[in-house]
Amino acid sequence: LLVVSKNRSLKDIMPCILEEKHRLFGENRIQKAEKKFVPDVISNFDISLHLIGPLQTNKVDKALSLFNTIQTVDRPKLVNEIYKSIQKQKFPIVTQNFYLQVNIGNEPQKSGILVDELLELYDKCLKFNLNIIGLMCIPPANVQPDPYFEKMLILRDDLNPNLKLSMGMSN
């Protein structure tokens, strides 16, 4: 279970870490994750940190040095930037895994690759040897999510049945 700790302080989430033994956390902003999950917290408690918010190309280096997994790879330009950063290796790279974010509801206000462009993005990632371990989506708000979850399952099975699915809801 990925615990989304956005808008919570380290003090707020310490009971999750200490008492409930949660080790898998999601953050939607790099700056907030940096302040909350300092190196001592990550190493002392063996925290695995996932980026679940949009990633700007100018922040790729920072994200690769902080998050174990980036769940919001959603466009070819971002894949190019990730690949370039990994090739340069000017800093310790923490990120080992990536998810492709799918705009499953085709909503213009949301990030994510469109369904009909997913295969091309997936192939590009494989060409660059990025370890794609799953697909991520956030279904439209205020509607029954099941049809979107089913569509993601079909997409995953068509693309690669071994991929994981991360299908979150804010409400």
Task: Report each predicted region and the residues it spans.
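Conserved alpha/beta-domain cores
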Residues: L1-N171
